[in-house]
Amino acid sequence: MVSDAGTPAISDPGFLLVRACVEAGLEVTCLPGPTAFVPALVASGFPCDRFVYEGFLPHKKGRQTKWLSYKEEERTIVLYESPHRIVKALEECVNFLGADREVCVAREISKLFEQFVRGRAEDVLKHFQQTPPKGEIVLLVKGI
């Protein structure tokens, strides 16, 4: 299985194919490849020894519940988000986790326009309200 959008089976249904191969008794080998969240996590400056990878937040149902579950999370939270929903995600972060919660938005990892915006959730929100982002985004939230 090969993907032109990061490591197969990370935030996509590729695991179904892997599971079917395993169940059929086929050998599965994985070569390390590009996954945006690993370099984003390392370069965020947040603790990397314990983190939780959540992938994409639900679009509607269960979204608020997810945010509320992060309120007491001690580990660094790693999320994928689309450029047209990052402002909404940051607004929710401010509302549910607090304006002072530290976040890092990593954008276009390993590409020409790679960018890291770090700081208080409220300040990072203001940045992206004024400058709408483009490209692939990883949102990292520091644990408590």
What are these regions (language model features)?
Residues 76-144:
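A contiguous loop/helix-start segment that scaffolds small-molecule binding in enzyme catalytic cores
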Residues 7-10, 59-60, 113:
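Short, small-residue-enriched loops and turns at beta-alpha junctions
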Residues 1-6, 10, 77-81:
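Acidic beta-strand-to-loop metal/phosphate-binding motif
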Residues 12, 16-73:
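Class I SAM-dependent methyltransferase SAM-binding "motif I" and its flanking Rossmann-like core
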Residues 11-15, 64, 87-90, 118:
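Conserved strand-to-helix beginnings and helix N-cap segments that scaffold or border functional pockets
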Residues 2-4, 50, 104-108:
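Short beta-strands and strand-loop turn motifs
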Residues 8, 35-38, 111-112:
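Short gly/pro/ser/thr-enriched loop/turn and capping motifs at secondary-structure boundaries
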Residues 3, 30-33, 79, 105:
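General beta-strand structural signal in soluble alpha/beta enzymes
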